[in-house]
């Protein structure tokens, strides 16, 4: 299927939603699997709500996720003349008609339907009337002359065969009274003109599929293959919302998630491939199949994403993690007293410490916070637990072990560990009773990477300086 063309078509009214990110991923994977193309169309016809900032956020979010699109970005609003041309063609062919119903008539129509418990549908009153009967001063809309008998059927790759009775579908508006095209018309025309072969989108568009299928049939165009994927719900089964947590791809970026980890997590929301949970990009492309997408809503498990991100952090090279940390410094550094860029010395220190740092961190933010000891100014600010470890004789034990450390001819993880063990044995105390005050004095925290690795990374002068600061406070 080398001619496969998919598209991701977001509306630029806000950030790139996590659900939109998954939709883009599924379109990207399907296109890449079949050697096809994924196009990007910005559906910016709602001029009041569409913003340049939102467009930038969408493009940036897709790029960060590693989802490259093919060709130039297409802007729907710029194609309005083409949409009008198609509507006028349907009108000329008798497949559409001008409707002169006034806003007051339409309001009364809806209210009558509510009173009588009927669906809110346009009643077709101008379907067969002569335009010469049009009331003065009413600018018409153009409506599709939809079939009133039979069925409209969508053979959906995910949902299966979906059938609508045509009597339940009214004559939808194609062109508004001001000449602007509706979403339904614009999507069909754009997908056709762009050569889209496969429409993969959220199942909240399933009813739209029936409407759009009718437009395709009226135009005599081939209906693309359709796949309506289940929406993402929160852990409680309710539709994902702000109360569940972060919603935008940019928020997860800011929280310190790796794009590869988020991509991996998103692909497993609604799609499965046996029991496999962790996929490289190449494995995703090779395995992806629309038939393996379920119909039930996928539940977003924040803890599972966090654990998966931790796996990715541990599997990422130390140099790449340092680069990832540097990428978030402009937003995360100032609050921690860090510059927007590492100097060579601090970069080298981070690189040396990374094997220990990444063992416990589940996000880049956690990793940066656990690296506090690398960049903390002296004297270190101690958290409450660290302060507790230095009480009850902790500082005295620091003062006792200092001479042994100061006398070391060679400073390394192995030599410092041996010196501390020798002191603990000579003082007849448990190793932990010496190691924990040392950890607190060196890192300002009660937990850290391996203590002696910390000492090796900090080096002799910085380590001894921090220990003397706290020993003197005894």
Curated annotation (Swiss-Prot):
GO terms for cellular component: cytosol. InterPro entries: aa-tRNA-synth_I_cd-bd, aa-tRNA-synth_I_codon-bd_sub2, aa-tRNA-synth_I_CS, aa_tRNA-synth_I_cd-bd_sf, Glu-tRNA-ligase_bac/mito, Glu/Gln-tRNA-synth, Glu/Gln-tRNA-synth_Ib_cat-dom, GluQ/Sye. Keywords: Aminoacyl-tRNA synthetase, ATP-binding, Cytoplasm, Ligase, Nucleotide-binding, Protein biosynthesis. GO terms for molecular function: ATP binding; glutamate-tRNA ligase activity; tRNA binding; zinc ion binding. Its main location: cytoplasm. A motif ('KMSKS' region) lies at residues 239-243. Its EC number is 6.1.1.17. Transmembrane segments: none annotated. Monomer. NCBIfam families: gltX_bact. This is Glutamate--tRNA ligase 1. It comes from Methylobacterium sp. (strain 4-46).
């Amino acid at each position: 299927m080398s001619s496969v063309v998919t598209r991701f078509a977001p509306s630029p009214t806000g950030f790139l939603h996590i659900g939109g990110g998954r939709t883009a991923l599924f379109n990207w994977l399907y296109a890449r699997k079949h050697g096809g193309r994924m196009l990007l169309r910005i559906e910016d016809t709602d001029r009041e709500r569409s913003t340049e900032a939102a467009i930038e956020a969408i493009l940036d979010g897709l790029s960060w996720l590693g989802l490259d699109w093919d060709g130039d970005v297409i802007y729907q609003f710029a194609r309005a003349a083409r949409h009008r041309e198609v509507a006028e063609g349907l009108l000329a062919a008798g497949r559409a008609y001008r409707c002169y119903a006034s806003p007051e008539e339409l309001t009364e129509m809806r209210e009558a339907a509510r009173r009588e418990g009927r669906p809110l549908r346009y009643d077709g009153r101008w379907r067969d009337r002569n335009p010469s009967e049009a009331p003065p001063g009413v600018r018409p809309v153009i409506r599709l002359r939809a079939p009133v008998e039979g069925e409209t059927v969508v053979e959906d790759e995910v949902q299966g065969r979906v059938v609508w009775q045509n009597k339940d579908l009214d004559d939808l508006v194609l062109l508004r009274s001001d000449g602007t095209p509706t979403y339904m018309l614009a999507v069909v025309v754009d997908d056709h003109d762009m050569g889209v072969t496969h429409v993969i989108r959220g199942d909240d568009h399933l009813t739209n599929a029936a409407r759009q299928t009718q437009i395709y049939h009226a135009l005599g165009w081939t209906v693309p293959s359709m796949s309506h994927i289940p929406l993402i719900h929160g852990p409680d089964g309710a539709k994902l919302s702000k109360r569940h947590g972060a919603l935008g791809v940019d928020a997860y970026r800011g929280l310190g998630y790796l794009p590869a980890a988020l991509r991996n997590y998103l692909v497993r929301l609604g799609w499965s491939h046996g029991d496999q949970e962790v996929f490289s990009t190449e494995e995703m492309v090779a395995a992806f199949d629309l038939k393996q997408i379920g119909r039930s809503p996928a539940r977003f498990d924040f803890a599972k994403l966090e654990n998966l991100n931790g796996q990715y952090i541990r599997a990422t090279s130390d140099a790449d993690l340092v680069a990832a940390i540097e990428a978030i410094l402009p937003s995360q550094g100032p609050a921690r007293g860090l510059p927007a860029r590492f100097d060579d010395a601090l970069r080298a220190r981070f690189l040396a410490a990374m094997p220990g740092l990444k063992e416990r961190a589940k996000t880049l933010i956690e990793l940066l916070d656990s690296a506090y000891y690398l960049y903390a100014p002296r004297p270190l600010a101690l958290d409450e637990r660290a302060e507790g470890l230095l009480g009850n004789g902790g500082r005295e034990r620091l003062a006792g072990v200092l001479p042994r450390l100061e006398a070391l001819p060679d400073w390394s993880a192995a030599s410092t560990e041996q010196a501390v063990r020798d002191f603990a044995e000579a003082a007849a105390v448990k190793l932990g009773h010496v190691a924990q005050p040392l950890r607190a004095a060196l890192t300002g925290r009660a937990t850290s990477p391996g203590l002696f690795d910390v000492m090796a990374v900090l080096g002799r002068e910085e380590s001894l300086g921090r220990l003397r600061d706290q020993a003197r406070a005894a």
